[in-house]
Amino acid sequence: VGGDVEAGLAIAELISGMKKPTVSLVLGGGHSIGVPLAVAPMVTMIAPSASMTIHPVRMNGTIIAVPQAFEYLAKIQERISDFITGHSHIQPERLAGLMRETGQLTADVGTVISGREAQEIGLIDRVGTLSDALEELYGMIERRKAEK
């Protein structure tokens, strides 16, 4: 834990704090720290054939088995989960359940959800294409101009 997770969450915070119109489009597979990045913009979309993999924080390498290490993991997981639920419409309990699922990923914990399912559970605003994402972005820009 550290570099990738911390950097990804920091970038997601930057995107979510922008005042300029922002739209995301998940293509292929959104995985791991890609989930906070996907939900950070003002409007979020996912391609019909795309998927998202939701899983808890992972560690590899040498791990010191002390309570502090597990507390640190729990704090990072809480920060990520809070960001996701704060920038989408998914319920915290639903997100936690998807992260703890044991019947889907081989020898792992987590869930792979389809584009349509990501929308249905409130993780992503809607299913769309690049054209839809650009249309939304240009529409946001035009509405912003009209407000001035």
Predicted regions and their residues:
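N-terminal organellar transit peptides
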Residues: 1-35, 39-148
